[in-house]
């Protein structure tokens, strides 16, 4: 394939050197004028109180402007540019208003929409300019992009025969540009078909609320694929697009695109900038797909109820106008304020020129015979020029009507039908018998009655599917109902309309053969032989006439897909021509294998030459039976949903008055071969289980039907319920079995854990060791008596009080009595030993004694002297200072007492006369203050007062300090015990791991023994226990278990090797 051989031609048609034509239009509705949003003067256009120059817009359509005025202003030139080989786009932008919807889609016969007028004029022009050497095919697509959901919806997907249902996406390819992939491009042949698909897309747009309308955009395109046949074959594509855009979110709080963001994208596309804002968003990609290849773009702005939205639209229009003026001046052209009506300016770099004929019809002269918009704008379409790369320059022209002709209105489903009239002329119904399969043949142009009410893409509450999925039909009777497949057309049809509408002008005949080179023909034939094509129903003379060639038979049986159509396409007109040349052969019924007439054929008629024909007929009958099964299931599902009772069991008689178009609907309804094969497999599986079959009449549309006599169908609802019950029972049994297995495994694991736990407890249950450890710990807390005098060792004992003994406590009377009595005895004995001696001053106040010191007693008379007393006081002071040093050096190991700086209480000699200071009154304490008896008085007759003396932390709180010091000095034995316990626990853990590994090896060895047939050894291994290792030390037991694990591993390897050898010999 070669597109262009000359470098000059490539530069001439380069997109960078081609200036796209741009027009700006504004539409003012009656609502805008009534609410004061817009007003028009002689010089300015006032929008929301601000004046804008009228020269900003090429055309301003007032409230009294008609649709014909808009067609004359820009739509006729747009269609002319498409026929001249360019891509054209009409972009309508504005809020949701009645004025915008009426301008685009119309609402009555007198007020047709722009999209409908473009479709009508385009199809009429194709019929009027039909060329025998050129074939033009029109395909229609419609998608919707939602900003809120970030999704792309294919509005024509219900009519796409492709069973794969691939996801539609917009691809940004650096080599080919932006294009829409996997969209449903439906082939249209007549105006009514195009309007039917347009009706589907428009209904999606009409039912949207204001917010959804703002954030969604609808893209409708009509693609013209042209192929020129002759000594060489040329082809290309041009496209007419309509982009109905919203105005975006009101604010960007939720992350959506607003009107300024959309305006920046449009402005960047008009300015041909390399950097485009929001390049990765689906909305930006859709705008690029619509405007990147367009050579003739028209903006139609409309205004809404929000003042800020109207101001944003006006600012965007001004910016686009300034950009257009700069681009024209930069390329040496003078910008004109307003374009003349019905004309199109010539462009120095465009593909051709447009002139006005004397009759008022614009005629476009093209540089070459056939040019494509893709050739001039982008490189996304392959152009096949045949084996010869040279291009002829024979002039050709395309004539377009200047004024719009009679246009059929849209069959609106969301509007009032009072203004809709019948079609101007009826359409004849003809069923196509062409075996050539393309994207349009599998499309169902109307829906059977059983499917009505089941909306595949709208909500059930809207109830629009009944009229949405049926093209507009005429109430008049068809003048000449055709007789195809042996059937008749019913004249009293109200359930749905036409099937395939035939154009009013007969199609031109095409050549039966194509001038292709041998290499291309071989590739096509190889593809047709290797492709897997599902059987189809058709009646063709290819197998009626046995004298046909092998090539023609392959053309009839083979199914061409869309990629092969881009190279070469066989249209229905070529098959119609070949059918007419074969003579008046009578067409057989597609279900003739199920009728009695074909079952009673005499065997002598069948011969060897008709075997191929029989195989084709059997394939058709199999497809028909699949259709019956599918429709029967759909009918059963419909009856179950509506709550209707099952019809009476019986056999239905065949009806020969079946309408041909209705039978074609049933045949086409089963084109999804994957689903049909699945249903056939289910029938074969249930055939052995279900002995009793319920025979129901095939009443698919509750009208006249045609079924072979004796045909049986299955009650799919009952079968599905039974299968569902069996499936539930089976699943329940499987679940119970899994639970049982899990319970058994848990029991085994529990027994193993118990056994291991008993072994561990037995190893750790060493009573003698525990008793020794407890005895060693108690030795540190044992109470040892202090060494006192020689004769009175039990009088004074030194013991360690708990920490709470150091807290202040009030002395009780019982304590005082005991202390007073004991001291009285001591004083009496002392008086008898040394008469006339003064009382010891040590008995008059509290004295702090060092640890393990002796209490002062009166047994020895040597301690009664004052000199001894002073020495004892000096020694006590030295011991207190030493204890303070020791306590200071051990600050990090013990807590400092909060009462360290407190003084001892004042004692006035009598009970209950102590001060509020701290005094040690615990019974048996080493620091009790001797109480002076009441008999001892001073010289003046008063009780002598004790001296007040301050004590440090070692005086009254020696017991608390001793407790903390004891706790810190006895930490070393505890750390050693902890290390020993950790060693024991590590040995226990190691033993557990080895024991678990041994258990795993035993299990694997048991399975290996069973695999080679040694059941006895397997039982012995399973019943073996570890009781023989009891009583051993831990290290010995660990060594023994390691040795046993090595032996088990060797035995396991030997068993596995033995099993492999046996398997190899077998």
UniProtKB/Swiss-Prot annotation:
Q: Which PROSITE patterns match?
A: KINESIN_MOTOR_2
Whether Disulfide bond counts among this entry's keywords is: no
**Where is each Kinesin motor domain found?**
15-326
Any idea where this protein resides?
Cytoplasm, Cytoskeleton
Q: Which GO terms describe its biological process?
A: axon guidance; cell migration; egg-laying behavior; locomotion; mesodermal cell migration; microtubule-based movement; negative regulation of motor neuron migration; neuron migration
**InterPro entries per record:** Kinesin-like_fam, Kinesin_motor_dom, Kinesin_motor_dom_sf, P-loop_NTPase
Kindly state one GO CC term assigned in the UniProt record: striated muscle thin filament
Keyword Phosphoprotein part of the UniProt annotation: yes
Sequence similarity: Belongs to the TRAFAC class myosin-kinesin ATPase superfamily. Kinesin family. KIF26 subfamily.
**UniProt protein name:** Kinesin-like protein vab-8
